[in-house]
Amino acid sequence: MFMGEYLHTIDGKGRLIVPARFREALGERFIATKGLDHCLFVYPLDEWKVLEEKLRALPFTQPEARAFVRFFFSGATECELDKQGRILLPANLREYAQLDKDAVLVGVSSRVEIWSQALWANYSRQAEDAYASAAESLVNLGI
């Protein structure tokens, strides 16, 4: 399980250090793709396979499902850790997530999210404001 928040710098070649706790759970190879809210989603291979099966089961005749699956998979790339525990983020993913120098890696249960520091700060402020009302809504779902 992934949890916590870590700030790291992306070097000039587009490499990002993955925190040691995340490296252990991700393994040597994993998948990074375009996430929601302009962050990147990073999945261990076993989690990716489960998600892939669910997405393949969506009806491709529905425009929303087709668009989501297309966008999600078009950004997906297999990543591998180097000897220093870094990953090379492709330019298209860095551009999508507006990553230039400072990145925040966030553990979100079954995945890691990679955010630009500025977008994460903005998102966190908004999420903090909505946190209490979201908790109240989740009570209705039995959580």
From Swiss-Prot:
One of its GO terms (biological process) is negative regulation of DNA-templated transcription initiation. The keyword DNA-binding applies. The keyword Repeat applies. GO terms for molecular function: DNA-binding transcription factor activity; transcription cis-regulatory region binding. One of its GO terms (cellular component) is cytoplasm. InterPro entries: MraZ (IPR003444), MraZ_C (IPR035644), MraZ_dom (IPR020603), MraZ_N (IPR035642), MraZ_sf (IPR038619), SpoVT-AbrB_dom (IPR007159), SpoVT-AbrB_sf (IPR037914). Its main location: cytoplasm. Residues 5-47, 76-119 form the SpoVT-AbrB domain. It is found in: Cytoplasm, Nucleoid. Pfam families: MraZ. Keywords: Cytoplasm, DNA-binding, Repeat, Transcription, Transcription regulation. It comes from the Bacteria. Belongs to the MraZ family. Forms oligomers. NCBIfam families: division/cell wall cluster transcriptional repressor MraZ (TIGR00242). HAMAP family: MraZ. This is Transcriptional regulator MraZ. The lineage of its organism: Bacteria, Bacillati, Bacillota, Clostridia, Eubacteriales.
